[in-house]
Amino acid sequence: GGICVLPQGSDYDAFFEDTMHAGHYENRRESVDIMIRSSRSVINDLLAMGVDFERKTDGSLDFTREGAHSRPRIAFHADITGKEITTKLLQAVRKLDNVQILEHVAMTDILTGERDGATVCTGVVAVSVDEDNSVRPADELANAAEDVHVGEPFKIHARHTLWATGGIGGVYDHSTNYPQLTGDACYIAQEHGIK
């Protein structure tokens, strides 16, 4: 696997057609256009974070052809592009002083409240799923009231909540996605009327 990128401007029309065709022409044309036009800046950002995409002997990116693509336009790292990207992104996030990472924690619901006459998300309900360690200290779990035991829900309050929910590939019998990608956040959003 890898990431589709517009290797040169002259490839735009073919890239657009390949993407529309792969999506059975049900894709939002505007979204496809944005994806293609922003692809190079996304790759440049990842390169700046240290992602090690494969390169040709002259140092330029090496592209491969996959799936519905009619030309080589996939930036990749061996056969573990996703791992390479997530490893480098996690390293970058761990350097941020204003970010707390809660590992082995899953969101089970959201907290809502009123702000300026509107219902807003004020945090999440989560559960520790770390089976190797039955108790996680409260200070590691964003102001939980006491020690949190595996399977016990706890609340995380926030002024602003951003959902980076992943995909839904894990709900299908045949998928190359991680089985943990079950779309739980999509369900929770639907239950709360979030669009």
Residue spans of the language-model regions?
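Conserved N-terminal/central alpha/beta ligand/cofactor-binding core
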Residues: 1-122, 127-147, 164, 168-171
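Residues at the start of alpha-helices and the adjacent loop-to-helix junctions
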Residues: 31-34, 150, 177, 181
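Conserved structured core elements
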Residues: 40, 83, 155-156, 179-183
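Short, mixed charged/polar active-site loops
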Residues: 135, 150-155
